[in-house]
């Protein structure tokens, strides 16, 4: 069978790429260059096995190699990878040029997996835990405003018997995270701190727990006052994930539980223009998902977050700010998500959101989550994994 005269062009770019890589390896060995492991891992992750297979298949069978198809191995792609490996600089990401030169810039190195409406490098979430002594400075709750908001946000719950099988664990690592409208004389984001369950994220956990129970889902809701616990242990607020990790482990070891899903509820420090979305005439507190990359279950957790984001956006367009992936250089990196392949950290709202907006978003999340939960449970039973 006569081979096409044009066949060499399909291999030329691949051969050039190999030559460049060999030259790069030789240069690294000769000059004893040090490559950032994070950059190397990200570069390798950009190569997908299915793309490699398709590339080699198309090279042998031109029927699978239409002219409009982009080549996987091109001089451009190879040169970009070479530059990234040799210098730890990604030409398309300005943060990598100054990441090692400007103190604190690495805190904004969060990877955007799915960008929700308005999400870009300028609106990335970042972590900042206040000192324990600041957390202990209790602020007064705006009692009258809280009662009024709770009255407007009241929801008739159907009284049902809690399911015996507990499969969902809800907790709040930063339980002190509160909201300015619920506190007296609170003006700036750093003021949004409270240990009163009515005014902090524990209240959101209670709402979510009750919603899920009414959907027939068994829930264990931890209401630990993390400020008090950290203070009693003589630990700084930066150790909050270690403390909540112990709570998670205790819950898992309880033989009365059959925990699969783990939801850590947080509140973002961004202001209202970023954390609020009007949907069908009502304001919702926007939410987003954070996935820790420093453990071997992160890909499965990432799939869960992406699926929930997609479902939320389908029903409530604009409610999700997206899905973010973090390593230890940008935060904790694990967030206790190594306990399960169905673990998630959900940031609900920001410092300026009130209970009406927050409760609407909690209700929206639990509606979507419960549908996903039951569909996943049915799929397990069909496949014999239940």
Where are these regions (language model features)?
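Sec/Tat-exported extracytoplasmic proteins
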Residues: 172, 208, 212, 216, ...
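Catalytic-core regions of hydrolytic enzymes
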Residues: 198-274
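Long, well-ordered alpha-helical scaffolding segments within enzyme catalytic domains
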Residues: 203-206, 299-319, 356-380
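Active-site-adjacent mobile loop/cap segments within catalytic or ligand-binding domains
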Residues: 323-384
């Amino acid at each position: 069978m006569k081979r096409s005269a044009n066949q060499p062009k399909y291999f030329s770019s691949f051969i050039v790429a190999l030559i460049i890589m060999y030259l790069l390896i030789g240069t690294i060995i000769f000059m004893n260059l040090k490559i950032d492991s994070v950059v190397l891992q990200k570069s390798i992750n950009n190569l997908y096995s299915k793309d490699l297979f398709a590339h080699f298949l198309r090279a042998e069978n031109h029927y699978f190699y239409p002219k409009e198809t982009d080549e996987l191995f091109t001089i451009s792609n190879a040169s970009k990878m070479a530059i990234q490996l040799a210098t730890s600089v990604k030409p398309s990401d300005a943060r990598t040029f100054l990441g090692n030169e400007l103190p604190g810039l690495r805190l904004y190195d969060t990877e955007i997996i799915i960008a929700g409406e308005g999400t870009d490098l300028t609106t990335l979430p970042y972590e900042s835990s206040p000192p324990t002594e600041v957390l202990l400075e209790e602020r007064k709750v705006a009692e009258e405003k809280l009662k009024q908001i709770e009255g407007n946000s009241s929801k008739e719950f159907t009284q049902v018997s809690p399911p015996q099988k507990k499969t969902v664990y809800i907790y709040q690592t930063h339980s002190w995270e509160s909201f300015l409208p619920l506190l007296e004389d609170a003006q700036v984001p750093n003021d949004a701190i409270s240990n009163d369950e009515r005014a902090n994220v524990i209240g959101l956990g209670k709402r979510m727990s009750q919603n899920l129970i009414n959907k027939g889902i068994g829930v264990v809701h931890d209401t630990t006052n993390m400020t008090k616990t950290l203070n009693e242990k003589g630990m700084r607020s930066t150790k909050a994930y270690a403390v909540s990790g112990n709570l998670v482990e205790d819950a898992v070891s309880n033989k009365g539980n059959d925990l699969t899903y783990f939801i850590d509820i947080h509140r973002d420090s961004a202001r209202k223009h970023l954390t609020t979305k009007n949907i069908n005439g009502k304001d919702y507190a926007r939410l987003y998902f954070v996935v820790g990359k420093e453990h071997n279950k992160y890909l499965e957790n990432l799939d869960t977050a992406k699926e929930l984001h997609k479902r939320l956006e389908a029903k409530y367009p604009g409610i999700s700010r997206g899905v973010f992936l973090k390593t230890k250089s940008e935060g904790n990196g694990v967030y206790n998500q190594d306990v399960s392949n169905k673990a998630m950290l959900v940031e609900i709202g920001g410092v300026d959101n009130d209970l009406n907006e927050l409760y609407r978003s909690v209700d929206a999340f639990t509606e979507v989550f419960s549908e996903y939960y039951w569909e996943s449970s049915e799929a397990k039973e069909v496949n014999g994994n239940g």
